[in-house]
């Protein structure tokens, strides 16, 4: 009998997950287009989060970009909620195990678009075993200029990502 190995339990892959994209490809394309063009693309795409609330990415990004702040320059952050506290879900684990570069590219594109210099990945406590591989991925991205100061060789852009490990409790949504 043939042995079948399950890697991530995705039965149907969309266009993003079905193709291999080199690390940084989406980030370089987003930087080349610029923040306003990226917002326009998000509006047309009608891309929505995977959390179930149905909020469009455009509304989240536009709100963050236009938000006022008492501090100058304004501090903006990109938060990726990988807590996955909903019963029976494993989308975050799959994405971070098999497609971490796409997640980090997406966070970086969001950062450039909204004017953030810091991203925070909130990782579910039960997924602590993913932490070493994710940290190595972030270090590789820094060595390759895909995170940190002078993002993608641009002295005027900076973006970095930190990982914060949760304690195993459901916290909140993205908004």
Model-predicted segments: where are they?
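Feature of Fe-S/electron-transfer and energy-metabolism proteins
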Residues: 1-175
């Amino acid at each position: 009998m043939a042995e079948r190995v399950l890697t991530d339990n995705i039965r149907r892959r969309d266009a993003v997950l079905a193709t291999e994209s080199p690390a940084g490809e989406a980030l370089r394309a987003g930087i080349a287009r610029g923040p306003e063009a990226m917002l326009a693309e998000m509006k047309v795409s009608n891309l929505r989060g995977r959390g179930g609330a149905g909020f469009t990415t455009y509304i989240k990004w536009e709100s963050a970009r236009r938000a006022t702040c008492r501090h100058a320059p304004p501090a903006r952050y990109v938060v990726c909620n990988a807590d996955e506290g909903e019963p029976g879900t494993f989308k975050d684990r799959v994405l971070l195990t098999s497609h971490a570069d796409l997640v980090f590219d997406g966070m970086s594109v969001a950062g450039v678009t909204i004017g953030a210099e810091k991203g925070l990945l909130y990782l579910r406590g039960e997924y602590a075993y993913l932490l070493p591989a994710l940290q190595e991925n972030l270090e590789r991205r820094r060595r390759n200029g895909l995170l940190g100061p002078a993002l993608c060789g641009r002295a005027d852009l900076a973006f970095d990502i930190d990982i914060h490990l949760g304690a195993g409790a459901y916290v909140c949504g993205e908004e």
